[in-house]
């Protein structure tokens, strides 16, 4: 049997606005080899290859240079656990070399990085031979490349099931069990030889030292990925820096470094975990497919992922890939793509492998969320509450679809914990819509010119001496009355999409109004007139009308949005919605004692104290009075009425709803007394599922037996209430066990209900591979 391979090798609003310029062009560093890479974009995915031509001297030199670079980067990644380039840069170099070799086959040698399983084994541990070789995976990077790969596989054999699983970004490990007893654990190494880490693996709570059950195989070699939980990563680095140690660049390096400790007792202190996803040598183990093997692994007590499915069509596979691309941060470990495998072992054997990778599996790589770049400087930004936030000025770099030149460092303590110096090469992370963040330095690239950041002692905007309130991590400017930065940020925040969403009142408008003394605080916004803009450059009648219409609309926004716009410390959308839902008017909130506010679900003592303190300030009460005098509503409609139809009903919304934005759907629920939460729990009354729902939320609803509503059911919930909605909900009869593989080797691990399949059926018809 062929061995299946492993699955994977705020700040302030001004900073956010400046740091996320959308980029449509390719970076200059990548454009250098664009023509060669484009010609080979189908390599590894079944694409046609251009006719070979003789290699020039420059081509030969470039190929040799690329081979040397790739070998060095692989050594630093797999052996030293200390990479100096990002995964994205490594992939780019590999694709360039692959392209050159496809154009000029004479450049391809047996020892080329394109022909080898990446990695080597360290000399720090005893080398051991794997019973069966661990192969790498070919990569595809978009739908077209995946279609080409799938079509090639389907031409060679009739594929009746594609197993899709998350590609864990961790350290590949090989486990050997004899008569059910763990006898050896080794790293991947070069695929043939790894390093013996058995004592260290035994410290992982998730890895059984003896397999469960009476019918364990005589011999079982399994492959998997050891990972470091993302939520624990920052905590580890902080402790390392505090002790004078070297921080890890990312969770993958933390996993590798923790597992390769000479003293297993150190490994035992790290919260490592593992997922098994592959089969090597075996005797006495019977399974017809990958999914059936996973079911057996689970019976033996081996850790297997619940986040996989066996799907019938390429359309369904791509839907899985893109769904998890949106939900990649909903799992406990980092993922950088999805691995797709032909499920049946017989078909895997028929398709075979190259010297490097199986033909029956491929990794669909997501756009990189981590890259390396130079930290040019560290500066500070003053926010609307006076918080002074360090941020990094970077050499602009493309990450997650945006060109990023600025990134948050949160606070001065965080700069110290991360161990970053001005001039460092740093790892930059941008996850989805999250503000770009500097993860840590690449210490091995330091040349001695780097320097430490020194926090300023006075506000860079108004010159006031900065303070650090007792018990807080943030340093603040106490000049809340006159600091121009704070006033600017307060106005910009009030008008932002998360608050009153005032069309036309952006950052530049806020600056212009303040500098011309047309406004002095946020209360003045509701008293703007056409005369307020007289003499201001760039404000024509059309622009003025747009802003004034935006202010008029803001006067009638829901109460929670006004609460957010007031910039009360700690009061974000969640707490604001809870307070508005419970008390219904700003007067009631202002008059409520801290104990009453703290009793509101989702508020608590810290937020309650901040609200009481804010309204205790006479200047703030004057601002509220001026807002009211400007015609703004300080109460929600129906504030004097009794109970509402969805009082106490918790709803989770996932996917896209026709005719509803996420904000409008949320406000529809909250306006009827319900609340919308971000995660599914036993307290959730309904999960509303639109098109392309988040996999984790949907599966959690099924496992807990929470009623699921489609869009029509959501309409019933809003119009007729919870009881009527339950009658048309899709719900499990009883809470389901955690999703487990299908032992039949068929199409269902885990099951996908018929309504969800029907939504995708039409899309899948045009996507099915030939044959």
Curated annotation (Swiss-Prot):
SMART domains: BRCT, HhH1, LIGANc. This is DNA ligase. It comes from Frankia alni (strain DSM 45986 / CECT 9034 / ACN14a). GO terms for cellular component: cytosol. Its cofactor is Mg(2+); Mn(2+). DNA ligase that catalyzes the formation of phosphodiester linkages between 5'-phosphoryl and 3'-hydroxyl groups in double-stranded DNA using NAD as a coenzyme and as the energy source for the reaction. It is essential for DNA replication and repair of damaged DNA. Its EC number is 6.5.1.2. The lineage of its organism: Bacteria, Bacillati, Actinomycetota, Actinomycetes, Frankiales. Residues 1-23, 731-742 have a biased composition (Low complexity). Keywords: DNA damage, DNA repair, DNA replication, Ligase, Magnesium, Manganese, Metal-binding, NAD, Zinc. The active site is at 167 (n6-amp-lysine intermediate). It is an enzyme of class 6 (ligase). It holds the Pfam family BRCT. Residues 641-731 form the BRCT domain. It comes from the Bacteria. Residues 1-34, 728-771 are annotated as: Disordered. It catalyses: NAD(+) + (deoxyribonucleotide)n-3'-hydroxyl + 5'-phospho-(deoxyribonucleotide)m = (deoxyribonucleotide)n+m + AMP + beta-nicotinamide D-nucleotide. The gene is ligA. GO terms for biological process: DNA repair; DNA replication. InterPro entries: BRCT_dom (IPR001357), BRCT_dom_sf (IPR036420), DisA/LigA_HHH (IPR041663), DNA_ligase (IPR001679), DNA_ligase_AS (IPR018239), DNA_ligase_CS (IPR033136), DNAligase_adenylation (IPR013839), DNAligase_N (IPR013840). Belongs to the NAD-dependent DNA ligase family. LigA subfamily.
């Amino acid at each position: 049997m062929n061995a299946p391979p492993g699955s994977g090798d705020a700040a302030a609003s001004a900073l956010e606005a400046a740091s996320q310029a959308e980029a449509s062009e390719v970076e200059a560093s990548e454009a250098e080899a664009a023509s060669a890479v484009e010609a080979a974009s189908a390599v590894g995915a079944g694409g046609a290859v251009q006719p070979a031509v003789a290699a020039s001297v420059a081509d030969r030199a470039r190929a040799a240079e690329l081979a040397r670079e790739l070998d060095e980067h692989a050594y630093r990644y797999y052996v030293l656990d200390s990479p100096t380039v990002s995964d994205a840069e490594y992939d780019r170099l590999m694709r360039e070399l692959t392209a050159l070799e496809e154009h000029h086959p004479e450049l391809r040698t047996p020892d080329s990085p394109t022909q080898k399983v990446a990695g080597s084994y360290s000399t720090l541990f005893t080398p051991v031979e794997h019973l069966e070789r661990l192969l790498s995976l070919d990569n595809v990077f978009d739908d077209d490349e995946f279609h080409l790969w799938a079509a090639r596989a389907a031409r060679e054999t009739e594929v009746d099931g594609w197993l899709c699983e998350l590609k864990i970004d961790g350290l590949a490990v090989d486990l050997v069990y004899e008569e059910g007893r763990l006898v050896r654990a080794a790293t991947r190494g070069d695929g043939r030889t790894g390093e013996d880490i058995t004592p260290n693996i035994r410290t992982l709570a998730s890895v059984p030292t003896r397999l469960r059950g009476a019918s364990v195989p005589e011999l079982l070699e399994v492959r998997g990925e050891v990972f470091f939980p993302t939520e624990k990563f920052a905590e580890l680095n902080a402790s390392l820096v505090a002790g004078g140690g070297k921080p890890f660049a990312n969770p993958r390096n933390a996993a590798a470094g923790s597992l390769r400790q000479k003293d297993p007792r150190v490994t035992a202190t790290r919260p490592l975990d593992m997922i098994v996803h592959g089969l090597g040598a075996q005797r006495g183990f019977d399974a017809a497919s990958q999914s059936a093997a996973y079911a057996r692994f689970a019976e033996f007590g081996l850790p297997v992922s619940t986040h996989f499915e066996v799907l019938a069509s390429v359309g369904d596979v791509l839907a899985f890939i893109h769904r998890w691309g949106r939900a990649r941060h909903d799992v406990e470990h980092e993922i950088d793509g999805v691995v797709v495998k032909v499920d049946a072992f017989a078909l895997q054997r028929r398709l075979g492998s190259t010297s490097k990778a199986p033909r029956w599996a491929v990794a669909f790589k997501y756009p990189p969320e981590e890259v390396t770049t130079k930290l040019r400087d560290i500066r500070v930004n003053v926010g609307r509450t006076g918080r002074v936030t360090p941020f990094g000025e970077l050499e602009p770099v493309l990450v997650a679809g945006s060109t990023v030149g600025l990134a948050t460092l949160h606070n001065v303590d965080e700069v110290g914990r991360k161990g970053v110096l001005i001039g460092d090469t740093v790892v930059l992370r941008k996850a989805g819509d999250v503000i770009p963040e500097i993860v840590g330095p690449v210490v091995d690239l330091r040349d001695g010119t780097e320097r430490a950041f020194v926090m300023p002692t006075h506000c860079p905007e108004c010159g006031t001496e900065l303070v650090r309130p007792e018990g807080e991590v943030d340093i603040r400017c106490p000049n809340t009355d006159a600091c121009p930065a704070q006033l600017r940020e307060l106005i910009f925040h009030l008008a932002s999409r998360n608050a009153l969403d005032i069309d036309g009142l952006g950052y530049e408008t806020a600056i212009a109004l303040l500098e011309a003394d047309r406004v002095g605080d946020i209360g003045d916004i509701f008293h703007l007139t056409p005369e307020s803009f007289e003499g201001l450059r760039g404000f024509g009648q059309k622009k003025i009308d747009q802003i004034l219409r935006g202010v008029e609309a803001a006067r009638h926004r829901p109460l929670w949005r006004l609460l957010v716009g007031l910039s009360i410390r700690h009061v974000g959308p969640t707490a604001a919605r809870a307070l508005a839902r419970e008390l219904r008017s700003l007067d009631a909130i202002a008059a409520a004692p801290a104990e009453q506010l703290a009793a509101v679900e989702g508020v608590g003592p810290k937020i309650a104290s901040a609200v009481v303190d804010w309204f205790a300030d006479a200047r703030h009460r004057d601002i509220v009075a001026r807002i009211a005098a400007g015609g703004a509503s300080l109460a929600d409609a129906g504030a004097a009425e009794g109970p509402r139809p969805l009082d106490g009903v918790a709803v989770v919304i996932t996917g896209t709803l026709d005719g509803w934005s996420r904000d409008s759907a949320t406000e529809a629920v909250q306006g009827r007394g319900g609340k919308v939460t971000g995660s599914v729990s036993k307290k959730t009354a309904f999960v509303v599922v639109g098109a392309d729902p988040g996999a984790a939320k949907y599966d959690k609803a099924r496992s807990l037996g929470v009623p699921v509503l489609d869009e029509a059911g959501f309409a019933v919930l809003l119009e007729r209430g919870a009881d009527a909605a339950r009658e048309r909900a899709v719900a499990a009869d009883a809470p389901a066990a955690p999703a487990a593989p299908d032992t039949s080797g068929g199409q269902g691990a885990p099951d996908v209900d018929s309504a969800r399949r029907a939504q995708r059926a039409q899309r899948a018809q045009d996507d099915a591979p030939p044959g």
